[in-house]
Amino acid sequence: APVVDDIDVALWQKFCLFAPMSGVTAAARCTLGDIKRDPHLNRLYKDGLAETAALGRALGVALPDDIETIMWDRLSGLPDSLRASTAIDIEAGRALEVDWISGAVARLSQDHDLDAPVHRTLNAVLQLWKDGRA
């Protein structure tokens, strides 16, 4: 694994990529290819990414100014068939970690007077399956 200068930045970069991917692929039952190609899913992902980055900055994480572009470029390089584990879990009827992903972004954003409508909505949609369903 590469050595990083600031572990908080590295963790938040990963969270910026993953949090909207998790929520969108689970709620829409889609792949990254769908997010890349569909303008509605594309916008939903990018807005969720911006919300996550804004929260990281509000928490004092020194994210790069162009984090949204960096993470979109990273997502664009991932296989189209990829889905977040949350999407796989929902289809398998397993419990979801939504409270710690989109739920956390929504909750912490509210605590810091930030609006996070994408994560608030993804959290609300996915709550129905939070405890799993067979």
Model-found features: residue ranges?
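Internal alpha-helical scaffold of NAD(P)-dependent oxidoreductase catalytic cores
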Residues: 1-66
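NAD(P)-dependent Rossmann-like dehydrogenase/reductase catalytic/cofactor-binding core
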Residues: 42-134
